[in-house]
């Protein structure tokens, strides 16, 4: 298969210059995950994993000691400097949001008894038969509904957990809480996922996840073939009178794992928002450097603007739809996104 040799970073006010980076093969991605796992195993998972098995069993919903140590039953992990004590092998897991949390719970092969539900998410088809739809919403979790499933573990993404804590909506008094870390930047999801699976004594699960992701990348690469050889793609979005270009994000990392040249412009991003760069509808020249655009919100009014319609890839009909449920997540979502990108670039034929 023809190889795309580099991922280029372009800037709208200067001539593009290529910075060559070798294509990541399936073996490269596999080696990257292996290095992560081995490193995490040697060093432990932040400060908390060094203490795995060293503390007695304390229920997260009780401040009293059981009086006996049961280290085989519990595991300690650290997320954002907070330590959480969790059951090593939970029996009744409730998932509070249907994106990163559900992705992780499915990857970890947890016995899910109930989950928040998003009918538009590709993850729903992977939910085990018999799992119930959790009452309440992401914004307003329903404690009564959660309790009705008698959970021994709650799973929630870090962003939502922070929101619940800020609003005083949910605590650890119902059951122990696994706060899913999706990475400090969108492109660090692999390291965060591998770290948590390893910390939870699920290294073998992490290895299976790696193999599945590599296999999906290989299938997607084969389908893309030489369609994008020597070409670039942009991962973008439209809203609020602007078009934005993704830089250091989940979707960009998956495209790069596919070996694609991805147009980015971190140099012109706001200092506090380096993951994407935003442009007014009058300054869209950078997008002419892309041969294909994967666009979030393609039905937005901004996508109907005359300046956007003059972008080269738009004129050529080389625009795909970045679905909301594929824009962020962990390995299951990454696999679905890789397959979706391979399908959508077929318009280049």
Regions found by a protein language model. Name each.
Residues 1-40, 51-57:
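N-terminal secretory signal peptides
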Residues 41-47:
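N-terminal export leaders
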Residues 61-70:
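Bacterial lipoprotein signal-peptidase II cleavage site
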Residues 92-108, 205-265:
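Basic- and aromatic-lined ligand-binding clefts that recognize polyanionic substrates
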Residues 92-94, 98-145, 153, 158:
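A short, structured surface patch at a secondary-structure boundary
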Residues 150-156, 289-290:
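Proline-aspartate-enriched helix->loop->beta-strand connector
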Residues 169-239, 334-349:
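Extracytoplasmic substrate-binding proteins
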Residues 287-349:
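Structured C-terminal subdomain patch of bacterial secreted/periplasmic proteins
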């Amino acid at each position: 298969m023809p190889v795309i040799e580099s991922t280029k970073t372009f800037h709208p006010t200067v001539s593009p210059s290529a910075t060559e980076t070798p294509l990541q093969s399936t073996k490269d991605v596999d080696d990257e995950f292996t290095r992560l796992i081995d490193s995490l195993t040697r060093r432990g998972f932040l400060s908390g994993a060094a203490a795995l098995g060293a503390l007695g069993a304390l229920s997260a919903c009780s401040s009293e000691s059981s009086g006996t140590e049961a280290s085989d039953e519990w595991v300690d992990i650290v997320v954002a400097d907070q330590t959480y004590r969790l059951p090593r092998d939970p029996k009744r897991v409730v998932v509070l949001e249907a994106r990163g949390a559900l992705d992780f719970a499915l990857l970890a092969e947890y016995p899910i008894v109930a989950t928040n539900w998003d009918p538009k998410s590709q993850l729903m088809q992977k939910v085990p038969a018999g799992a119930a739809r959790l009452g309440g919403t992401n914004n307003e979790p329903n404690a009564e509904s959660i309790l009705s499933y008698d959970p021994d573990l709650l799973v929630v993404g870090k962003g939502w957990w922070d929101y619940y804590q800020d609003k005083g909506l949910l605590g650890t008094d119902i059951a122990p809480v696994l706060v899913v870390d999706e990475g400090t930047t969108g492109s660090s999801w692999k390291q965060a996922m591998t770290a948590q699976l390893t910390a939870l004594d699920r290294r073998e699960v992490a290895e299976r996840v790696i193999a599945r992701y590599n296999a999906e990348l290989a299938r997607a690469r084969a389908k893309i073939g030489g369609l994008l050889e020597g070409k670039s793609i942009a991962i973008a979005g439209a809203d609020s009178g602007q078009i934005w270009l993704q830089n250091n994000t989940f979707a960009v990392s998956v495209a790069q794992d596919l070996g694609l040249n991805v147009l980015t412009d971190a140099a012109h991003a706001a200092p506090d928002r380096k993951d994407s760069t935003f442009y007014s509808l009058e300054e869209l020249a950078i997008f002419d450097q892309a041969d294909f655009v994967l666009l979030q919100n393609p039905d937005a009014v901004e996508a109907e603007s005359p300046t956007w319609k003059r972008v080269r890839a738009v004129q050529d009909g080389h625009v795909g739809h970045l679905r909301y449920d594929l824009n962020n997540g962990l390995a299951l979502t990454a696999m679905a996104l890789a397959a979706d990108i391979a399908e959508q670039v077929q318009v280049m034929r």
